[in-house]
UniProtKB/Swiss-Prot annotation:
GO MF annotation list: potassium ion transmembrane transporter activity; symporter activity
Organism the protein comes from: Geobacter metallireducens (strain ATCC 53774 / DSM 7210 / GS-15)
Lineage: Bacteria, Pseudomonadati, Thermodesulfobacteriota, Desulfuromonadia, Geobacterales
Disulfide bonds, paired cysteine numbers: none
InterPro entries, per the entry: K+_transporter, K_trans_C, K_trans_N, Kup
Keyword entries, A-Z: Cell inner membrane, Cell membrane, Ion transport, Membrane, Potassium, Potassium transport, Symport, Transmembrane, Transmembrane helix, Transport
Annotated function: Transport of potassium into the cell. Likely operates as a K(+):H(+) symporter.
Keyword Membrane among UniProt keywords: yes
Pfam families: K_trans, K_trans_C
Ion transport recorded as keyword: yes
Membrane topology according to the record: Multi-pass membrane protein
Name of protein: Probable potassium transport system protein Kup 2
């Protein structure tokens, strides 16, 4: 029993390192390299920057995410959409709910934009380490971009197969990576032990006071050390809170030791540029190529974790009706979270390669990086503060508020990146944001334009037609949004066309504000020959409608569903109509048997 507990204890930590800490774990590759291009490599500046890095990791990752955010899970699930679902239940005012909805849209959009920049900067920065291999010093930047693009291409092609089989290796590889970071850090610190004093926050305060506005703008690069911190909370549903927190103790220690080691190396070699790679090469030239291979593997794992995270966010968005339906494939038979969304995968690949070609170097990419991360952190901070103020944990409000204000400071510092490439963060985030706004507003307008009939009025006509006895043998299913209101396509089928079966079943699938759990309720006899089958599922559940129907003894002959043909002169609704046509419909999303499907077109004026 004790052995089993020990295995699960360490197993959880190792898994977390592979699935959660890839992004933040690969930040040492480029963080100090980028910062040192903007400041002097003297003792005061180096110690000040190291102190800022250490305290950024403590405040923004340990306090904001590991402590505050992770205390707000819903059945173990975390993330921006979960915060929104918690808040919507707590708030009374419609305006507040609308504000929270918009915040969630912004948070999700920034995270999706970040999903493009992270693989690009991680893979490109690792590949750039090839220039330190003897004889490869003059490797053209175009060649490095090509190698990085090929790695990205292979990574995205692999998504379709599912990463289930290789995911077991992610944890052990990342354990070796963090071990290598720790070891190289310790060796470097031993040569210049005075860097350890950077742990004291007075160095950070002194740096900011002495450097004024320039010091303030350095914060926009310091935040690079905390990119990926949001994964602690977002991935909570995959692994659970405790393993992630335990793993963070080890990861935090490895990161701090390595950053201090890099600082010590800068003090001894103030003219070096590619700091992590130069440090490792100076310590063990013979191990440099294996370390470079390990770095590339670590960045691939970091990118993989982020791609899986994007799939998960998009799936949450689909089931909570803030994103259009898309074709989803399940790549694992035993892991619920292992999904593949082809349209998202290929869009990400194109965007990642495009960003590599636009920015060319990882240090240029750093200009676009950070804005999305700090924006997400600030939004998380606002939502957490609102939640704590509406619950019994009011004592956490001042702490959450203080952290949110610090997020705002980092976000403000990042605004100066806008002219230098930071605008790409906003462009990338604006695409999903526009889709979400158009989709949610379009769905509401479409629902109003459809003018559904209330059930009681429908039953008057239905009862008369059913009583005539000209009914088709078997069972017909009709998909509706809710049983109480009948959509026009059902009226067209049954009332106008007299397509009526011996048994007719209204089927509705709605999502609860809990992540998991499925309830299926069959109500017989809501009208003569008419039943209602209502499914209420958690927004992370993968629902097998056919299996649920069979469990209740419903063997359908045909499945009817509505298709809206939208006619409009409004450019906003034209975009909505195009999105609706190009994305999956309800029956495609839920993989219902094609041979039984019968789509009924309704023309709608919007």
């Amino acid at each position: 029993m004790v052995q089993e507990h020990t295995e699960s204890f360490w197993g959880g930590i190792i898994k977390s390192m592979g699935l959660v800490f890839g992004d933040i774990g690969t930040s040492p590759i480029y963080t100090l390299t980028v910062i040192m291009t903007l400041t002097k490599p003297d003792a005061e500046h180096v110690l000040g920057i190291l102190s800022l890095i250490v305290w950024t990791l403590i405040i923004l990752v340990s306090v904001e995410y590991a402590w505050l955010a992770m205390s707000l899970g819903r059945k173990g699930e975390g993330g921006t959409i979960v915060l929104k679902e918690i808040l919507v239940r707590l708030l009374k005012s419609g305006r507040q709910v609308a504000f929270v909805g918009f915040l969630a849209f912004m948070g999700v959009s920034l995270l999706l934009g970040d999903g493009i920049i992270t693989p690009a900067i991680s893979i490109l920065s690792a590949v750039e380490g090839m220039r330190l291999i003897p004889g490869w010093e003059n490797l053209a930047q175009g060649v490095l971009i090509f190698i990085a693009a090929v790695i990205a291409l292979i990574l995205f092609i692999f998504q379709f197969k599912g990463t289930d089989k290789v995911a077991g290796a992610f944890g052990p590889i990342m354990v070796i990576w963090f071990g290598a970071l720790t070891l190289s850090g310790i060796v470097s610190i031993a040569g210049t032990p005075e860097v350890v004093s950077a742990v004291s926050p007075h160095h950070a305060v002194t740096f900011l006071m002495h450097n004024g506005l320039a010091g303030f703008f350095i914060l926009s690069e310091v935040i690079l050390c905390a990119t990926g911190g949001e994964a602690l909370y977002a991935d909570m549903g995959h692994l659970g809170r405790k393993p992630i927190i335990r793993a963070w103790y080890f990861v935090f220690s490895a990161l701090v030791i390595n950053y201090l080691g890099q600082g010590a190396f800068i003090l001894r070699n103030p003219n070096e540029t590619n700091i992590l790679f130069s440090m490792v090469k100076s310590q063990a030239p013979i191990l440099y190529i294996p370390f470079l291979c390990l770095t590339i593997m670590a960045t691939i794992i970091a990118s993989q974790a982020l791609i899986s995270g994007v799939f998960s966010i998009v799936y949450q968005g689909i089931t909570t009706r803030i994103l259009p339906l898309m074709k989803v494939d399940y790549t694992s038979t035993h892991l619920k979270s292992q999904i593949y969304i082809g349209s998202v995968n290929w869009s990400l690949l194109v965007a990642v390669i495009f960003i590599m070609l636009i920015f060319k170097k990882s240090e240029n990419l750093a200009a676009a990086y950070g804005l999305a991360v700090t924006g997400t952190m600030f939004i998380t901070g606002i939502m957490m503060t609102m939640i704590f103020s509406h619950t019994t944990k009011k004592w956490k409000v001042p702490i959450a508020l203080a952290v949110t204000l610090i997020d705002l400071v980092y976000l403000t510092a990042n605004f100066h990146k806008l002219p230098h490439g930071g605008y790409w963060s906003l462009i990338l985030a604006s695409i999903p944001l526009a889709i979400m706004i158009i989709w949610t507003q379009g769905q509401k307008a479409l629902y109003r334009a459809l003018r559904p009939l209330d059930l009681d009025t429908f039953l008057l006509s239905f009862g008369q037609i059913y009583a005539k006895g000209h009914n088709i043998p078997g069972t017909g299913l009709f998909f509706v949004r809710e049983t109480a209101v009948v959509p026009p396509y059902v009226i067209h089928c049954i009332i106008r066309s007299n397509i009526i079966y011996e048994r007719n079943v209204f089927v509705s699938l709605n999502r609860s504000d809990e992540p998991f759990g499925v309830k299926a309720n069959l109500t017989k006899g809501i009208g003569p020959g008419l039943d209602s089958f209502e499914i209420l599922a958690g927004y992370m559940e993968l629902v097998d409608i056919e299996r649920l129907l069979k469990k209740k003894g419903i063997e359908e002959k045909v499945i009817f569903y509505g298709i809206e043909d939208i006619a409009t002169n409004n450019p906003f609704w034209r975009v909505f109509s195009t999105i609706k046509r190009q994305t999956a419909n309800f029956v495609q999303f839920n993989k219902l048997p094609v041979s039984k499907l019968q789509g009924v077109v309704t023309r709608v004026e919007m």
